[in-house]
Swiss-Prot record:
The keyword Oxidoreductase applies. InterPro entries: GlycerAld/Erythrose_P_DH (IPR020831), GlycerAld_3-P_DH_AS (IPR020830), GlycerAld_3-P_DH_cat (IPR020829), GlycerAld_3-P_DH_NAD(P)-bd (IPR020828), Glyceraldehyde-3-P_DH_1 (IPR006424), NAD(P)-bd_dom_sf (IPR036291). NAD(+) binds at R12, I13, D34, R79, N315. It catalyses: D-glyceraldehyde 3-phosphate + phosphate + NAD(+) = (2R)-3-phospho-glyceroyl phosphate + NADH + H(+). This is Glyceraldehyde-3-phosphate dehydrogenase 2. Belongs to the glyceraldehyde-3-phosphate dehydrogenase family. Homotetramer. The active site is at C151 (nucleophile). It is found in: Cytoplasm. The gene is GPD2. D-glyceraldehyde 3-phosphate binds at S150, C151, T152, T181, T210, G211, R233.
Length: 338
């Protein structure tokens, strides 16, 4: 069964979700909506990418449609999600990747146009959040709007789950050293809600807030209230790294911690949580489809109950692959429930 998908918002995540969908035979993107990007420009934006390189397939505009690898994708340009005719192209599942419609109420507008399910590619204040490898078993087919959480939560949660399951986490602090994103300014500019966030992205390390660590408590209830965190935005275009410092319930050597993470990466979390012993740097992970790659050589332990763990993630590509994985999983559960 191939699940037909619509994408609302053809920005960084929307475009990379389309790229990711091409390597999953269970999913086919049949429509894209973006009121700000004309069709010819869509072709250009999809073909060329400063981070992920030139698209290694064919892309063209033909008869008002975007044609990728010979397959036609309908293009809409509605500003109001309720007006997008998803039903006319049988796009049952919609990826909401504008970054604007992130609540259940706002994202539900897609249902009026014929969509059956909406996956928000961002954290949500009220939509249930799912992280592949962590809490997918809690998904039920009656849910109409769900969230794939954030790229940072997708990196942190699998690591936190392994540590908590094996040793117990008493409490912890997370810092993500995070690549620049589209909401930042190229040079100093106005940003009333976040003064630091208005400073030039290319010239600064910018302290910022993130709800990623607290969100782990929503997908792993046992960790609710035990983790919080912050971010440093840095002048790199892609790939971020989580620094998780935790106090453990059960003492363990760093070697023992590495062993359980390696085991999980080869078994139940294969493809989600990676493991490396190499002397890696951020660009080594551009295009890595995993949610989180544990850097065994970078972590440190003060004693057997207080450790710092380091894990990398391609905040664009890894996350976009999980959006597709979550969607495909939901479609299977929904089909079985019918």
């Amino acid at each position: 069964m191939v699940t037909q998908v619509g994408i609302n918002g053809f920005g960084r995540i929307g475009r990379i979700v389309l790229r990711a969908s091409l390597s999953n035979p269970e999913v086919q993107v049949v429509a894209i909506n973006d009121p700000f990007i004309p069709l010819e420009y869509m072709v250009y934006m999809f073909k060329y990418d400063s981070v992920h390189g030139r698209f290694q397939g064919t892309v063209e505009a033909k008869d008002g449609k975007l044609v990728v690898n010979g397959k036609e994708i309908s293009v809409f340009s509605e500003r109001d999600p309720a007006q997008i005719p998803w039903g006319s192209v049988e796009a049952a599942y919609v990826v909401e990747s504008t970054g604007v419609f992130t609540s259940i109420d706002a994202a539900s507008a897609h249902l009026q146009g014929g969509a059956k399910k909406v996956i928000i590619s961002a954290p949500s204040g009220d939509a249930p959040m799912f992280v592949c490898g962590v809490n997918l078993e809690k998904y039920t087919s009656d849910l109409k709007v769900i969230s794939n959480a954030s790229c940072t939560t997708n990196c942190l949660a699998p690591l936190a789950k392994v540590i908590n399951d094996n040793f117990g986490i008493v409490e912890g602090l997370m810092t993500t050293v995070h690549a620049t994103t589209a909401t930042q300014k190229t040079v100093d500019g106005p940003s009333n809600k976040d003064w630091r966030g208005g400073r030039g992205a290319g010239a600064n390390i910018i302290p910022s807030s993130t709800g990623a660590a607290k969100a782990v408590g929503k997908v792993i209830p046992e960790l609710n209230g035990k983790l919080t965190g912050m971010a440093f935005r840095v002048p790199t275009p892609d790939v971020s790294v989580v620094d998780l410092t935790v106090r453990l319930e059960k003492g363990a050597t760093y070697e023992e911690i590495k062993a359980v993470i390696k085991k999980a990466s080869e078994n139940e979390l294969k493809g989600i949580l990676g493991y490396t012993n190499d002397q890696v740097v951020s660009t080594d992970f551009v295009g890595d489809a995993q949610s989180s790659i544990f850097d065994a050589a970078a972590g440190i332990a003060l004693n057997d109950k207080f450790v710092k763990l380091v894990s990398w993630y391609d905040n664009e590509f890894g996350y976009s692959n999980r959006v597709i994985d979550l969607l495909a999983y939901a479609a299977k559960v929904d089909a079985a429930a019918q």
